[in-house]
Amino acid sequence: MEFCLAQPCPQGNHEATSSTFNTFQPMNLTQGRCQNLSCGSRPSMQVMKEQGVQLSPRTNHTVVSASAPGTAWVLGNADRAEEVPGKGDLSLQAETRAWVQKTQAHWLLLKTAPLWFHGFITRREAERLLQPQPLGCYLVRFSESAVTFVLSYRSQTCCRHFLLAQLGDGRHVVLGEDSAHAQLQDLLEHYTECPLSPYGEILTQPLARQTAEPAGLSLRADSDSGSKRQDPDTQLSLLLQQGQAQASGHTEKVWASQQKATSQASRPRPPIPAKPQLPPEVYTSPASRLHQAPPINPIYQEPDEPIAFYAMGRGSPGDAPSNIYAEVEGPSGTAPIGHPILRKCWSRPISRGQVREVQGKISSRSRAERGSPS
C-alpha cells in the first residue's frame, strides 16, 4: 500500500522534513509507470487480507490512521505501502524481537544473519549509508513503525523504503506486489531482474553491514532465550545440571582443602639447626686477651740444682733483649760447677752490669792463674 505526501509533515512533527532524501513522488506518476512496465495485476489491501497477510496491530493502525481527517498522509494508492517514519520506541523493538523469535528464528537466529540485514537501524541511518552507494544498492532492516521488515534501496532521485509482508503460508512479499517467495534472499534476487513497480527500478547489489551481528540483535542470546522459552523442560534440566555442577565443584574444593591440610599436618617438620658453639675467647674483648692469667701448671720443670748463668741460653727464647749470657770453659774444657762467686740463678735474666762485673772478675782470675807457677 503506497502513501504519497500531500503535506510536508504533521503539525509539530519535524522528523520527516530532515530526511536525507525525498522518498515520495507525485501521485499521478504511479499508475502510468506501472502500466508502461507491465508489472501485472497487484492485489489490493482487501485481497492481501484474504490471502492471510500478517500485519501487526501497529501496521493496521498505521494504515487506518493514514486516512484519518487532518493527517499529513493521504491515501493515494491502496495497492502499495511505504514505511511511515516512526520513532522506533523500545516497546516496538520488544514486540519485534518477540515476533522474530516466534516466526523468523528458523533462518535468522539459528544461522548467520545475511550481510544485507542491518537489524535495528533508523530510517535516517539507512539513508546515510545508502547515499554514497550506486543506484540499486539495498539493505533490509526492521521497521520503525510496524513489526516487520523494510526494504531500503538507493534510487536515482531518492532513497525508497518499502514494507515487506509475510503471508499466512510463510512466504514474503513486497507489500502491494504479487510475487511471493519462501525466503527473503529469493525475494531480493527476484527484484534484481524484475523491476519494482511503480517506479521501474531494480536492485543491483546489497550493502554489507560493518558489524558481525545486526544492530540491536544478538543472535546467539536471542536464540538461546527463544529455545528456553519454547522448551521449559530443557530449561529446567539445564538449571539442574548447573546446580549439580556447582555442588560437585564445591565438594571437590572442600575435599582438596581437607587433603591439603591433612598432608601438611602429617608431614614431619625438619629439625632446626643448632647455632654453632664458639669458644669464649671469641666473645672477649682484645684488651682482656692481652692480660691473660698464667697457667697454673708450668710448662717446664724446675731443676734440682741451680743453673749457672752461662747456661741460661740453652732452651730459652733467643729474642729476649735482656737475656745476655756467655759460655766460659775452664782449663779442663768443662764449666766449673758451684763457683763461690756466682749467685744462684732461678731462670731469671741478669742485668748487663752484673754480667760485666762477673766477666771482669773471671778474666782477672784467669790472668792471675796463668802468671803463677804451677
Curated annotation (Swiss-Prot):
A motif (SH3-binding) lies at residues 267-273. Residues 268-279 have a biased composition (Pro residues). GO terms for cellular component: cytoplasm; plasma membrane. The keyword Cytoplasm applies. It holds the Pfam family SH2. Residues 116-207 form the SH2 domain. Proliferation of SH2D2A-deficient T-cells in response to T-cell receptor (TCR)-mediated activation is significantly impaired. These activated T-cells are defective in the production of interleukin (IL)-2 and interferon gamma, but not IL-4. Interacts with KDR. Interacts with p56-LCK, TXK and ITK. This is SH2 domain-containing protein 2A. It comes from Mus musculus (Mouse). The lineage of its organism: Eukaryota, Metazoa, Chordata, Craniata, Vertebrata.
